[in-house]
């Protein structure tokens, strides 16, 4: 064995979870190492060349508010910025960008390879080192023995990964890249519940062989909505995407060849993502539809590769070619690389604490697709939380937990560790009970101070954030003191009830058609700082009434939700609970009443029995 190396925190895996985990740990001043198969694939976008979207964009803004790396890299590599749901309210709008795949990888690598407190190694891990129920290090392919205080495992689709193209099966973690083998089997010895999930990707097409003439064009937004609160301007030329559709002939080709699909031949055992189905699944499950939309997304400014979003498949390559050649615009298209399905191991996330440390092995943290999620953004958000908590734990500080009213990150992690997954988990705005307050626009106001408190935030970001808060405070104070009567406001063509009650300017701002420009016509003493500050004031005013009620709901809920469940509760002795409920409580061991309530299959009645028991015990202790 070669000379030992020792680090305080080690991250295994250089995907989106691994990048955020390593960066977060390093930002907290911890001597951190990142181990990956290849340094040149750090930050690789394995599937679609895009970041963000509905729910996902919120996660990236929250990552950025906590000084994560994904938002900045997405902005620097963005080649088509679009704000989804722009016509709807800010609570459900989703920032998204098409990224240049090579630029994204380049900027992520530049960032991490120059990150303070972070060392990066290209050396696959082959064996963990355990000391009873504690992980203490690992051995690498080159024969190195690495010791660590905390270990974060972010293997993505590499854990016993298996690629399917028709009846061909190839062990791989990604196209032309070897999987991680043997690691699952080591964890299995500690009775981890390990399952198989599946995801897929479409064939890559040669843009030079596509006829674009009659295809609908989708343009970038003229006024880009960036992911990072620090980004001031767009760096890249903005491009268009094109749209085309499947048709009845294509559907017949797929139906005729279903048995040749790995999905329908019985080759694949893993469950795929419901919200990102293969084209085979679409044809079978939505047989009434005569066409399905396909977005032709360029993979880069200097790249001829097109990602046809909407036709993920595990059909044989010859069938993929036939399908493509019967789609409008793709009649003569050349496939650069076939689409495929990939199966991989995941660990039941109910095996984790909210810190993402495993319950069965101390000092071992899991983040990303190994926890049953799908998507770059979901992985990155978990990486951030695992990295923060591994570092804080090493420093013997309190854990960093975001709850469901704090962030979409908190919603996701709570869902994972309490409910587990039956299919790859994807974030949506509908998953958040408090989505009116968990908006993309206010992620910094919700989270940056929390990051400052634990030493996670850079001086640059802290200064910019505090300056923004100061400006918002100045305007809010003046507007809270500026009053006007219904009679006087009428002269400005603003209609309100003639009830003689004076209104504050922030109340007037909630009226239809009123913006900050109009407000300054009435109160010219209100200072103007910049467009972003005005937009934030307008959004805050719009949601003011709703948020006041929601805040009361959150406080009421938290009174019982945050009630801690003693570790010594004997669920088997609680009368009124079914054996199934007792088994779930014993398996998950919820820390709080709120966590108990969100366990899949647990009824409010069962939680009430537990709540009554905990409160009775508390009263006895006080007495």
Curated annotation (Swiss-Prot):
GO terms for biological process: tRNA methylation; tRNA wobble uridine modification. FAD binds at residues 13-18, 125, 180, 369. InterPro entries: FAD/NAD-bd_sf, GIDA_C_N, MnmG, MnmG-rel, MnmG-rel_CS, MnmG_C, MnmG_C_subdom, MnmG_C_subdom_sf. Transmembrane segments: none annotated. One of its GO terms (molecular function) is flavin adenine dinucleotide binding. SMART domains: GIDA_assoc_3 (SM01228). PROSITE patterns: GIDA_1, GIDA_2. Its cofactor is FAD. Pfam families: GIDA, GIDA_C_1st, SAM_GIDA_C. One of its GO terms (cellular component) is cytoplasm. NAD(+) binds at residues 272-286. HAMAP family: MnmG_GidA. Belongs to the MnmG family. This is tRNA uridine 5-carboxymethylaminomethyl modification enzyme MnmG. It comes from Pelagibacter ubique (strain HTCC1062). The lineage of its organism: Bacteria, Pseudomonadati, Pseudomonadota, Alphaproteobacteria, Candidatus Pelagibacterales.
């Amino acid at each position: 064995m070669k000379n030992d190396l020792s680090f305080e925190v080690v991250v295994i895996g250089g995907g989106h979870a691994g990048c955020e985990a390593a960066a977060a740990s390093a930002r907290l001043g911890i001597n951190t190492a990142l181990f990956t198969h290849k340094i040149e694939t750090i930050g690789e976008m394995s599937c679609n060349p895009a970041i963000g979207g509905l729910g996902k964009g919120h996660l990236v803004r929250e990552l950025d508010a906590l000084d994560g790396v994904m938002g900045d890299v997405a902005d620097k590599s963005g080649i088509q910025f679009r704000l989804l749901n722009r016509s709807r309210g800010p609570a459900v709008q989703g920032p998204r960008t098409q990224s240049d795949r090579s630029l994204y990888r380049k900027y992520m690598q530049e960032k991490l390879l120059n990150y303070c407190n972070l060392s990066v190694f290209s050396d696959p891990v082959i064996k963990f080192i355990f000391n009873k129920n504690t992980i203490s290090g690992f051995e690498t392919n080159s024969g190195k023995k690495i010791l660590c205080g905390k270990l974060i495992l972010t293997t993505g689709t590499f854990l016993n990964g298996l690629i399917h193209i028709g009846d061909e099966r190839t062990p791989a973690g990604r196209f032309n890249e070897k999987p991680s083998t043997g690691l699952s089997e080591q964890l299995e010895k500690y009775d981890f519940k390990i399952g198989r999930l599946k995801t897929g990707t479409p064939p890559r097409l040669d843009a030079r062989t596509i006829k674009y003439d009659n295809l609908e064009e989708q343009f970038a937004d003229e006024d880009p909505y960036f992911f990072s609160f620090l980004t001031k301007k767009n760096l890249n030329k903005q491009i268009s995407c094109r749209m085309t559709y499947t048709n009845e002939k294509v559907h017949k080709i797929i139906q005729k060849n279903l048995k040749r699909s790995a999905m329908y031949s019985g080759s694949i055992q893993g469950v795929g993502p419901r919200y990102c189905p293969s084209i085979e699944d679409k044809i079978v499950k939505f047989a009434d539809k005569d066409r399905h939309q396909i977005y032709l997304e360029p993979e880069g400014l200097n790249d001829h590769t097109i990602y046809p979003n909407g036709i993920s498949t595990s059909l044989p390559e010859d069938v993929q070619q036939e399908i493509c050649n019967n789609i409008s615009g793709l009649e003569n298209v050349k496939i650069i690389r076939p689409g495929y399905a990939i199966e991989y191991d995941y660990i039941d996330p109910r095996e984790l604490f909210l810190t993402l440390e495993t319950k069965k092995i101390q000092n071992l943290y899991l983040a990303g697709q190994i926890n049953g999620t799908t998507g770059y953004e979901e992985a990155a958000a978990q990486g951030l939380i695992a990295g923060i908590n591994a570092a804080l734990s090493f420093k013997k500080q309190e854990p960093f937990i975001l709850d469901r009213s704090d962030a979409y990150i908190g919603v996701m992690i709570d869902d994972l560790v309490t409910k587990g997954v039956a299919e790859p988990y994807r974030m949506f705005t509908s998953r958040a009970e408090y989505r009116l307050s968990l908006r993309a626009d206010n992620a910094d106001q919700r989270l940056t101070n929390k990051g400052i408190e634990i030493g996670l935030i850079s001086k640059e970001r802290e200064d910019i954030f505090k300056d923004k808060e100061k400006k918002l405070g100045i305007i809010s104070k003046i507007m809270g003191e500026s009053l006007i009567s219904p009679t006087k406001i009428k002269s400005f063509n603003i209609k309100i009830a003639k009830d003689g009650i004076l209104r504050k300017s922030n109340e007037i701002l909630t009226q239809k058609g009123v913006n900050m420009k109009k407000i300054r016509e009435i109160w010219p003493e209100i200072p103007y700082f910049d467009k972003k500050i005005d937009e934030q004031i307008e959004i805050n005013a719009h949601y003011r009434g709703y948020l006041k009620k929601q805040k009361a709901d959150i406080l009421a809920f938290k009174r019982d939700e945050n009630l801690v469940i003693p570790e010594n509760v004997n669920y088997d002795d609680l009368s009124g609970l079914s054996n199934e409920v007792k088994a779930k409580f014993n398996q998950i061991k919820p820390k709080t009443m709120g966590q108990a309530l969100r366990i899949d299959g647990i009824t409010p009645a069962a939680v009430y029995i537990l709540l009554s028991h905990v409160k009775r015990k508390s009263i006895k202790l006080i007495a």
